Amino acid sequence: NYEGMMAAGHYKLDNLCATVDLNRLQISGTTGQVMDSASLAEKFRDFGWNVIEVLDGNDCAQLVNAYEQAAAYKGKPTAVIASTVKGKGVSFMENQISWHHGVMTEEQYEQAVKELKEALQ
């Protein structure tokens, strides 16, 4: 919440790192339609935070790099804002609003695990 963001910036809590999963989907639509999140980085900066924006939050190497930068940054808390694709790597889930709150069937679970294992090979 904003009070927490303000307090962390005010007290220069440089051992604090917040991660925002910016997949642009929420239960009732896209964030652009329902509640725009375009200015999140600005809001964090306005409250005294260091901000690291990750272009592909589904790329583990980019996330590791961001967290290494956050750990090295002194004097401010850090917000890592990672642009992601909800359900990345699972064909029937990828970028689908319905999976913000969906429950898989056993068959869907097996298919998802299969696709993710194949992607790791």
Whereabouts are the PLM-identified features?
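Glycine-rich ThDP/TPP pyrophosphate-binding loop and its adjacent helix/strand module
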Residues: 1-121
